[in-house]
Amino acid sequence: MKITFLGATRTVTGSCYLLEVGAHKFLVDCGMFQGSKLIKALNEKEFLFHPGEIEAVVLTHAHVDHSGLLPKLVKEGFRGPIYCTKSTEELCSILLPDRAHIQEGEAEYANRKGMRAGKKIVEPLFTVDDASRALHLFKLRSFGEAFNVVPGVTVTFRVAGHILGSAFVEMSVNEGDKKTRLIFTGDIGQPNQPIIEDPAVAGGADFIITESTYGNRIHEAYDKEGELANIINDTVERGGNVIIPAFAVGRTQVLLYYFQKLQAEGKIPEIPIYVDSPMANRATQITMTNPEEYDEEARALYAMQGRRLVSMHNLRFTATVQESMAINEIPGSKIVISASGMADAGRILHHLKHNLWREDSSIVFAGYQAEGTIGRRLIEGIKRIKIMGEDIRVNAKIYNMKGFSAHADKQQLLAWYSSMKEVPKAFFVPHGELDAAMELADSLGRNLGTATYIPHFGDCAEIHGTEWQMHESEMVQVEPAAIDLRAFMRGMERDYLLQRSKIEQIVARNPDKAVMVRKKLEKLHKYMDDILKDL
């Protein structure tokens, strides 16, 4: 058998693995690249296989970096089953059409501008019809149910504890007299997350394809509820708003769960709470109607509140654009949860535009922020940022609450793997920025005494039973991380020219500052030299 790595290589997004077993081909995940414009442009590239030859897709969970290119796959000829859990199908039924609307809107906008310039018509990456046709191919499988994907390949979904419906994949492959056991982790969640169950214990495998999103980090053990309460109380005292860019699926529901608990305990005031995202509204409804996936605490609360997981009189779900716009006209402090979680699109941009300049407001990030996104730039301390074409001064307090991550950290992943009965022959380590993948791979090798490999895009693992060898890709493709670095450095060049002009004006008006400015610039120059020496 062969496994070709066609996404999430040395980056976090775009998960896609092509498996070839004899004459049969199928995929595990088919996700979108997310982040900067240059990284998202990778979605436009042709698949490195013919979609019509793919017999099936095994989908680990609904997040679009794992599911988002399924409509494109169908558009280009795929007609096989897409296997997933019930909740994953329900969540994809809102996520995929939403992505299609975005693609259609971006194409329409590009064509309006392009027609005036005489440019070629731009086709959307995929349409709402493509998303609908993809959803009709979904085949539901329960956790713990073994099923055949193609001849000789059996798959079982196990609880991954990442989001509702998320699964890691246990796979058994029989080729002649050779048998291979594989695990594809998808995304593994933190233990003790609210609402959903912890990741199930895996029995072991010959080879594991592991995520590494937080492979170089340890989640801080601290009182998340307490910090959230402090942020809200401090902001209300200042008279501002709490704006939370949050993933519509998973994070929004966890935040509501915490707010309900804090209010019930009298730790935060009962100010208006707005969920301003049609997708988050529907995802919350899906979460409320799947109690079979709740953990013990959530099940008890659900029963106690009359089959309602979240019940707050001050909670508002906005549907229309008019309702969304009206939020910023309402006096008094409020909490606004809106998508997207990385602040790179959606209604959250309007709320950032209205609140970033305000010293009394707070912006709270409670999730991973990919390279190149507005969220990443804000948590890294940028002082001015362009939102919806407007240059905005960042005066609001910016908080980065890392403990809310739905991804296991390095220690949690190591503990999960150490609990397995058998050590695999090798770990393949995609789904992480290079520094995270490298640190996790090193830790796995040292702690478990097993081989590790961090794939490049297009690399292929050839496996016979428990023997394996890598075939490095001959394709020339710049890694997403390198693409993003190039874009970042272009931004640095623009910033340098702006700063140079400002410095020259300051010194022209205040010649006595020239010596001080030169000394500081010399320090900066030396610092840049030191960086290059370290490389």
Regions found by a protein language model. Give the residues of each.
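Short, surface-exposed connector motifs at secondary-structure boundaries
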Residues: 52-54, 76-79, 234-243, 269, ...
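Active-site-proximal loop/helix segments of hydrolase catalytic cores
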Residues: 161-166, 173-175, 179-205, 212, ...
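Binuclear metal-ion centers of metallo-dependent hydrolases, dominated by the metallo-beta-lactamase
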Residues: 219-301, 423-479
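Pre-active-site segment of Zn-dependent metallo-hydrolases
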Residues: 9-11, 21-80, 84-134, 188-197, ...
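Metallo-beta-lactamase
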Residues: 99-163, 291-330
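Active-site neighborhood of phospho(di)ester-bond hydrolases with catalytic His/Asp-centered motifs
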Residues: 28-30, 54-63, 70, 82-85, ...
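C-terminal regulatory/interaction regions
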Residues: 261-264, 311-535
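Core dinuclear metal-dependent hydrolase active-site scaffold
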Residues: 1-52, 133-197, 322, 326-329, ...
